[in-house]
Regions:
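Long, low-complexity, Lys/Arg-enriched
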Residues: 1-85, 98-122
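Periplasmic-binding protein-like
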Residues: 86-90
Length: 122
């Protein structure tokens, strides 16, 4: 996996745990517009990864995490751009999790979830 797709979560650990574990070349965050436009918040995430010794590209894509159709459309665009991706469904809204699970089932894109003690590939 070169590209990790994260469903942005208000809980910071959910936004970094998978990337810190798998160390992909890039992480794409599907996030609300206030995060996609917040350069300071993006900078803090990038600084965290650099501090952890990761030279990883981060991409922030605006989407409504409460509308399944919008999440699915954004995931389609991500897969077109980064066909080597896998999707982490450990964070995000219930609607985004549903959309990502449905999308992965329909497209055969790898999907996983995790906790601090366990990683499950679905």
């Amino acid at each position: 996996m070169k590209t990790l797709v994260e469903l942005y979560d208000d809980c910071p650990i959910e936004n970094v745990l998978a990337a810190d574990t798998f160390r992909p070349e890039r992480t794409v965050y599907l996030c609300p517009s206030e995060v996609a436009q917040d350069k300071e918040k993006q900078k803090r995430l990038q600084e965290y990864f650099r501090h952890r010794g990761m030279d990883m590209e981060t991409v922030f894509l605006d989407t409504s995490l409460f509308h399944t159709d919008k999440v699915i459309r954004q995931l389609q665009r991500v897969v077109e751009t980064y066909p080597d991706c896998a999707i982490d469904i450990a964070g995000g809204s219930d609607a985004a999790l549903f959309a990502a699970g449905y999308f992965c089932r329909e497209t055969d894109i790898p999907v996983f979830t995790h906790s601090r003690n366990l990683i499950l590939t679905l």
